[in-house]
Amino acid sequence: MKKKIILTGGGTAGHVTPNISLIPKLKELGYEVQYIGTKDGIEKSLIKKEGIKYHEISSGKLRRYFDLKNFTDPFKVLKGIMEARKIIKKEKPNIVFSKGGFVAVPVVIGAYLNKVPVISHESDMTPGLANKLSTPYCNKVCVTFPETLKYIKKDKGVLTGTPIREELFLGNEEKGKKICGFKDNKPIVLLVGGSLGSKILNNLIRENIEELLKKFNIIHICGKGNIEKTLENKEGYAQFEYVKEELPHFMKASNIVISRAGANSIFELLALAKPNLLVPLSKKASRGDQILNAKSFEKNGYSLVLEEEELSKKIFLDKLNYLYENREKYIKNMKNSSFKNGIDNIIDLIEKYYTMKN
């Protein structure tokens, strides 16, 4: 009998890339891999590139704040549950793996209604709303931080680490520089604003561009629709809406990285031992998970943190220069970390549940 698994997760790239990192190993073990996502989420374009079957369902966004859509989106979620249940009943997967995000809730419930085992993964230190709603229907919940286990029912939580894409380790420094058109040997700052971009980070770089270019070349991943036309031919500055194949080369070429503090991103930086300046989303714009992630990494000596509330030109440039001058200390701390890539732990758990069901 053929092994079959359905993956789900979406809304941002952080809910998709960990799933993508599992696909090669799953295929190697003989699994037919399929995906359930939304009709127009970022997961659709990312997964289509992987050449696996993609199923579309409806899904409403889960919000912690007042919005008129809060009155209509629950009906979209109910519709999504019915659609996911129908897909899962037809495809008969042995297991469902969820990476969270609002699309995951209907899929997890749909699997539960079909008596299909579900394993989910929470990257952040505290569970997101989608994973909180999904947990009662999951057999196991994988976590990245040991501190997260206290939020999960004891018999469900498993410390696995987060899965890191193998291709990230295969970057070529010269190729990265060539793509960006850099001709000198200035140190390189890579800014990663996330798949949706970050207005604050984009402005931070662009408002200080002249000062930064005196010392650094800059690779700026700014998010969809955020290209600044007036800077398109600026020497030493390369901007991209979103990258995939190029990212390993950009990571390899960069000396320091500026990033938000989503768990997937920061654990990739840790795995690559890249000195980093983290600018976590403020509590006004999030549930505060990125602040907790960033503080944990700063405490362990892996990162330097700049909170949005203390943003100023002077503090930003001072911290960036401090990070560059002390980069070897951060590299050493990261290389001495006990962190391990979570791929094997998660795959072992998937295999365990496949064996139990069959």
UniProtKB/Swiss-Prot annotation:
Give the GO biological process terms: carbohydrate metabolic process; cell division; cell wall organization; lipid glycosylation; peptidoglycan biosynthetic process; regulation of cell shape
Name a single GO cellular component: plasma membrane
Question: Per its record, what are the GO molecular function terms?
Answer: UDP-N-acetyl-D-glucosamine:N-acetylmuramoyl-L-alanyl-D-glutamyl-meso-2,6-diaminopimelyl-D-alanyl-D-alanine-diphosphoundecaprenol 4-beta-N-acetylglucosaminlytransferase activity; undecaprenyldiphospho-muramoylpentapeptide beta-N-acetylglucosaminyltransferase activity
Which annotated residues bind UDP-N-acetyl-alpha-D-glucosamine? T12, A13, G14, R165, S195, Q290
Subcellular localization is given as: Cell membrane
Question: What would be one Pfam family of this protein?
Answer: Glyco_tran_28_C
Coiled-coil region(s): none
Q: Does the keyword Endoplasmic reticulum apply?
A: no
Keywords linked to the UniProt accession? Cell cycle, Cell division, Cell membrane, Cell shape, Cell wall biogenesis/degradation, Glycosyltransferase, Membrane, Peptidoglycan synthesis, Transferase
Q: What class of enzyme is it?
A: transferase
EC no.? 2.4.1.227
What reaction is this protein's catalytic activity?
di-trans,octa-cis-undecaprenyl diphospho-N-acetyl-alpha-D-muramoyl-L-alanyl-D-glutamyl-meso-2,6-diaminopimeloyl-D-alanyl-D-alanine + UDP-N-acetyl-alpha-D-glucosamine = di-trans,octa-cis-undecaprenyl diphospho-[N-acetyl-alpha-D-glucosaminyl-(1->4)]-N-acetyl-alpha-D-muramoyl-L-alanyl-D-glutamyl-meso-2,6-diaminopimeloyl-D-alanyl-D-alanine + UDP + H(+)
| Annotated TM spans | none
User: InterPro entries in the record, alphabetically?
Assistant: GlcNAc_MurG (IPR006009), Glyco_trans_28_C (IPR007235), GlycoTrans_28_N (IPR004276)
Disulfide bond positions? none
Keyword Cell division attached: yes
Per the record, the major location class is membrane
| UniProt pathway | Cell wall biogenesis; peptidoglycan biosynthesis
- Give the way it sits in the membrane: Peripheral membrane protein
**Which family is it part of?**
Belongs to the glycosyltransferase 28 family. MurG subfamily.
Describe the task this protein carries out. Cell wall formation. Catalyzes the transfer of a GlcNAc subunit on undecaprenyl-pyrophosphoryl-MurNAc-pentapeptide (lipid intermediate I) to form undecaprenyl-pyrophosphoryl-MurNAc-(pentapeptide)GlcNAc (lipid intermediate II).
Protein name per Swiss-Prot or TrEMBL: UDP-N-acetylglucosamine--N-acetylmuramyl-(pentapeptide) pyrophosphoryl-undecaprenol N-acetylglucosamine transferase
- Species: Clostridium tetani (strain Massachusetts / E88)
**Classification lineage:** Bacteria, Bacillati, Bacillota, Clostridia, Eubacteriales
